[in-house]
Amino acid sequence: MSVQSAIKRKTAPEIRARKGGDPVVMLTSYHAHTAALVDRYCDVILVGDSLGNVMHGFETTVPVTLDMMILQGRAVMRGSKEALVVVDMPFGSYEASKEQAFHSAVRIMKESLCGAVKLEGGVKMAETIRFLSERGVPVMGHIGLTPQSINTLGSFRAQGREESNWAPIEADARAVAEAGAFSVVIEAVAEPLARKITADIAIPTIGIGASAACDGQVLVLEDMLGLSPWAPKFVKRFGDLGPGIEAAIKDYADEVRSRAFPGPEHVYGMKAKS
């Protein structure tokens, strides 16, 4: 047995059991190298459809395809060893029917070898979540601000900032939990509402722009590292890597143009004649 196969990955049931316990730490990753770094400190790695923004420069996540998600899911699985890897189901891969969702989820899990999928939606997607969960597909829900619905929402804005708007979001949370999801992401929801939902439902809540009272937190890796030119209000910059990377690229370009690089220590000499 290889060393890698001997290491036990975290599972969806283990994350489910963290409700009310130690906070679940989750970050995104789309590459084997960053996955290896994230894996050392995080319980869950999300291969998010935010890769459309971060990797491909799309304005929204709508253009992301199933094949794109599977490809990056494979990379993250190869780079990580212990974290539960969750892959987003992209827009158009699950909404038409629960059967379509199952077919897409099976492709993701079989071809990437990930441990769970994530899909957006509450009450309207509850039947689909139940259908998948009953057929061996662990599902992480996603409510509040749902980026795949940008063309319906019109803009990315926080949800539930007036108490009169709480009921539909609370209903979404209950529906996802009762349908069998093992956890749910709550995005850009007013803090008091996120806190209330966390207290009211039986599965872990993973906050992103929600509340410190949530059962866990998630951020986009590039946002928290300072690699994105802009980040939402809810992002804390834990690093400022952008300027350092730019400085390194500038130094490289300057040394190439001045022929300072490569130096003698970076090239190969001839073998000594015997």
Curated annotation (Swiss-Prot):
It comes from the Bacteria. Mg(2+) binds at residues 49, 88, 120. One of its GO terms (biological process) is pantothenate biosynthetic process. The active site is at residue 187. Binds 1 Mg(2+) ion per subunit. It is an enzyme of class 2 (transferase). This is 3-methyl-2-oxobutanoate hydroxymethyltransferase. It comes from Rhodopseudomonas palustris (strain BisB18).
